[in-house]
């Protein structure tokens, strides 16, 4: 028994709809944007100095009460030095502005940490988390 001629058209139409939906699912945000990050320590933090290395980094932003100051260390390597200061102390929130959110996340290293009392702290236990 053969299928009616309209069933081929229905199958083709369903195939085109499924193919179109699959093409529309691109896997997430692309293009420029900001990756949010937080710095936490075992004690109340007032400031940290970070080294941030990555391709396509265009700037840094403080979030909440945090202020961000940055300088390019090596443009060829995409290496930046960032000072994050939160006078109230506690959770230090910041953003990294990038050219492409789909690119690999930057590598972040804590160089120096200080408490809200301006006393240097060991960077052991100070953790930086970036969103993907």
What residue spans do the PLM features occupy?
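Sec-dependent bacterial lipoprotein signal peptides
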Residues: 1-25
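Acidic, low-complexity intrinsically disordered segments
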Residues: 25-132
